[in-house]
Amino acid sequence: MIKVNNTFIIAIMGVDGSGKTTIAKHLNKRLKKSKYLHLKPYILFKDRRRVVQNPHLEKKSSFGVSFLRLLSWLISYKVFFRSNKNFKACIFDRYAHDILIDPIRYKHNLSKGLTKFILNYFPKPDLWVFLNPNLKTIKSRKHELPDKVLKHQVFNYSKFFKTQKIPYLS
């Protein structure tokens, strides 16, 4: 991964309902010259996010669309950090690597190997935060995903952080 100079990047990761948004927005208020971002900067395309009741029922994109989507994310990250040098901290509520943990959410259809290769060119967070509350807490906040899917995602997040050999808070 690529290191961005002078900007401290915090990537907060976890399943839906783990508290990412709450913590990220709180940090953004407390830190001077900081920027809150959800998943990625919206540089090439408008922010057209919408609440999807069950993201796992969405149909996967084609290889080409998945490749172009990830490439557009990479360009957006690069352009954002090159043109916004006055931020001391960027707090991400999810980070691009979330696509490895839950590719279905992003309708992602690239191999894990190719995805990891491309992700190596993304700016490297200085601090990864993995939020892992118990299943009861998660279910009290979010109801979109069944327990089996949530448990699988928690397992994948845990595996990601262990295998990446990157320092993180849990």
Language-model features and meaning:
Residues 12:
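Hydrophobic anchor at the beta1->P-loop junction of P-loop NTPases
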Residues 1-9:
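Extreme N-terminal, non-catalytic leader segments
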Residues 28-37:
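Post-Walker A helix-loop "phosphate-sensing" segment adjacent to the P-loop in P-loop NTPases
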Residues 39-113:
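ATP-dependent small-molecule kinase phosphotransfer cores
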Residues 94-160:
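A glycine- and Lys/Arg-enriched "phosphate-lid" helix/loop adjacent to the NTP-binding pocket
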Residues 17-18:
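ATP-binding Walker
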